[in-house]
Swiss-Prot record:
One of its GO terms (biological process) is ATP synthesis coupled electron transport. It is an enzyme of class 7 (translocase). It catalyses: a quinone + NADH + 5 H(+)(in) = a quinol + NAD(+) + 4 H(+)(out). Belongs to the complex I subunit 4L family. It comes from Roseiflexus sp. (strain RS-1). Signal peptide: none annotated. It is a multi-pass membrane protein. Keywords: Cell membrane, Membrane, NAD, Quinone, Translocase, Transmembrane, Transmembrane helix, Transport, Ubiquinone. This is NADH-quinone oxidoreductase subunit K. Its main location: membrane. HAMAP family: NDH1_NuoK. NDH-1 is composed of 14 different subunits. Subunits NuoA, H, J, K, L, M, N constitute the membrane sector of the complex. It comes from the Bacteria. Its EC number is 7.1.1.-.
């Protein structure tokens, strides 16, 4: 059995990579992927804590987080496609206004 601390360490590492992706990258698609990485690392931590306590409530919360993340991706990608059609770029620095 893998110790709980390894899962928490992996979750922290993945969350750190996600934060670095949000802070360093300027591409909107990479920003979305970095946010999803952070959400999934939080899910890993929640499942790990639920497994350590032998409680199913953490897994239920993770299910709802996955549902909300899927809705966020659907709306975010739809907005990104609409912005790309008008601006012809996905660079966040160049997409500074919502006017056409």
């Amino acid at each position: 059995m893998v110790p709980t601390s390894y899962y928490i360490l992996l979750s922290a590492l993945l969350f750190t990579l996600g934060v670095a992706g949000v802070l360093i990258r300027r591409n909107a698609l990479v920003l979305f992927m970095s946010v999803e990485l952070m959400l999934n690392s939080a899910n890993l931590a929640l499942v790990t804590f639920a497994m350590a306590r032998q409680d199913i409530a953490g897994q239920i919360v993770v299910f709802f987080v996955i549902v909300v993340a899927a809705a966020e991706v659907a709306v975010g990608l739809a907005l990104l496609v609409a912005i790309f059609r008008t601006k012809q770029t996905t660079d966040v620095d160049e997409i500074h206004s919502l006017k056409g």
